[in-house]
Structure formats: C-alpha cells, structure tokens
Amino acid sequence: MSNSLDRYVIHGGRPLHGEIEISGAKNAAVAIIPAALMVDGVCRIENMPQISDVDMLLKILQGLGARVEYLSPSAVEIDCTQVRFTEPPYDLMRKIRASYYFIGSMLGRFASAKTTMPGGCNFGVRPIDQHIKGMTAMGANVEVKNGFVYADTPDGRLHGAKVYLDKVSVGATMNIIIAATLARGRTVIENAAREPHIVDLANFLNSMGADIRGAGTDSIRIQGVERLHGGTYGVIPDQIEAGTYMTACAAAGGEVRLANVIPRHLECISAKLREMGVTVVEGGDSVLVRSNGRLRHTNVKTQPYPGFPTDMQPQISVALCLADGTSVVTEGVYDNRYKYIQELSRMGADAQVDGCTAIINGVEGLHGAEVRACDLRAGAAVVIAGLCAAGETVVTDIRFIERGYENFVGKLRSIGADIVLERDGAEQCAAAAAE
C-alpha cells in the first residue's frame, strides 16, 4: 500500500499497444467480503482484485475473528464460523466507504451492529439515509451518533419488508440485500439499482444458499433463509477498470485488447467512445479498442446503470479535453465530482465547471505538470492525462488509485506506457512481473 510520499512519474506522448487482462470487480468484491460474515462455513472467493480496499476489508474480518487465507494472489479462503459479535476495528473502518456493508451483514448474523461512518473517496455528499431506511423497515433501530452507526433488532432477527428507495442507490441496494438474506420472511426492494456488481453480490449469496431473485432489475425479491453454507465463487471482471483502459487507449492513441471482460457490461462506455470516433470491437470475453486520430466532441451525462457510469466520468472527461470542439459533461449521480478539473487545467486543459456540469473545450495537446489524485477515479483520470501530455507528469496521492486498480503501473507499462512508481523518492518499476 502506498504512503503519502509515493508518486507516479509519467513521460507522455507514447501510443498504447498490447493486451491487458482485467481483474475482478472492485465494487463487487467490497460487498462480497462483508457478506461472507454471514456464511456458516468456509467460502473460497476467486478472481479477487489485488487492491488496498480488499486488503482492508479482509483485515476487518480478521479483526472480528475470521480466518482469512490467501490460496493464490487472487483467491482467498474465508472462515467466519468462529466470529463472535464485537466492534470492528475503528482505524480500518474509517478509511473505506464499503465498510458500511458490515451494517447489513452484522445485523443479519448478530441482530446488532456498531460501525463507524464510512470513509473512502473524498468527493460529494454520499449519505447512508437509504441504507438506514431499509434496515429500519426490516425492524432495526438505527442511530447515527458521533461518527458511529448503532443498530440492533429488538426481536432478535430482522424481518422481511417492502422497501421503496427514494433514489436509486447502489450501496443501499446491496446493503439491504445483505441484511435481508437471513431475515425472517420476504423482502422486496423497489427502485433498486441494477449495476452488474449488484447481480454479482446476489449470485454469490445464492451460491451459498440464499434466495434472491430479480437482481439486475429495479425490483429485487429476497426470501430470507435460516443459514448460508460454504462454497466457491468467482468475482466478475471489473467494468470500470476495463473502461479506464479503453479510454486511455482512445485518448493516448494506439490499439489495445482487453481480455477477461463481459462486453455487455461495457456497452454504455463502448457506445460513447464510438461517438468520439474510436473503433470498439467486441468478442466473446474481450474488447478491442483502436484509436483513429483526433477524437470527436460529444456530450456525456452520468446515470445509474445501464446509463454511463459516474465512475467513468473523470476518465472520459480527459479524453474530451483533447477532442475537437466543445463537449458538455453532466454529473447526474454525485455532487462535487469535478475536483480533478483544476488538476487538468494545470496541464493545459480548457474546462469550466458550473454546478453539476463541466464545459470542456478541446485543445490540441496537454503538457506535463505535478498533479494530485483527488480520489480513486480522478486519480486514474490524471494518469491518463499524463499519458497524453508532452513532457513529464508527476502524480501524487496515489494511495487513492491503489484503492481500486490492481497493478496499475505494471498493466500500463505492459502496453507501452512510460510510467514508473517512486516510493519515498526511490524509483520502482513495479512492473517487473509484467515485463
């Protein structure tokens, strides 16, 4: 895991060529790990991304008393049978937003939970009111006080309920699914989010004995079961990691094949890149991306799946900074997700932000500068900008990037990028295994 002094040093202007294998989905893994707390047996999870968020969640499980063993770099065995109710480790919980999934899993298993308010990326206001609404509907008493979430169920077990989400929320949908899995009776979530990682969470739980139907639609039905048994499950490929490399190729130029993907999960990204003049060819489990010269301008609005993902907004905005003409980007999911625009301006981008909208006037080229990763996806965006820029770009605060991208430097170097990781001033190639 990186510290605050680590940085990426990039020399841009090199087109990208080659193949990258996409890792397991971060947004699925960070919900599956807390859900494993409810499994009465040993579960083996494969295709687990090697990222710091996963490391922290596994350490939280260990802090609760679980046995966690890596069988390979991407396969982990989890045994929570000996876990007894306790408070999760504060120093880890506060660092990661996905820690809120322990509210659902602890209520499901112990009928009680005490967790910290989640940390993670520092953009926007992302309250957990819809999570609380779902837990309350299922019979929990929930109180948020002094940065902690306290929850308990007076009846000793959650009960089924009909929950209508006031807004489409991925986190709330997943947390309610987790909590409802061991609840008494039937729970229905209306206006549910439909993202691929929600389907993956449901498939994981079903493989362990849950009864969840409708995941991937806006109406999800969960019939509570008495227990979950152990088993083996493989995490789906990461839609956002794939989209990031697709956009990097589009912006920097070249031709890159992405292996181990589910092309239908990428359709919203592929369609937008095609609008910009990029060739995207879909295979059975691969996508080929080919740049065809300067990009065309277009407009982008982020929406819940199957719309254009908010987690791809910063990356596509970098590409639009180099397109011909003016593009309009509208953030329809989170507020205050444009902190990275100031960093791009330091590199010569011409973009202005007005509320939830960014007006981007394409320029001929960017120049290197020292910039910071404001959050996970903003960090990926400034790296892409560095790959396109003339001269040297230095990216600081890279700990945000390592939260969600496995072997980011190594994968980029494998397709021709000139990027190195410097730890405390000492240059590290960090890609030796890929070269």
Q: Where does each model-flagged region fall?
A:
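Short, structured segments at the rim of ligand-binding sites
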Residues: 1-435
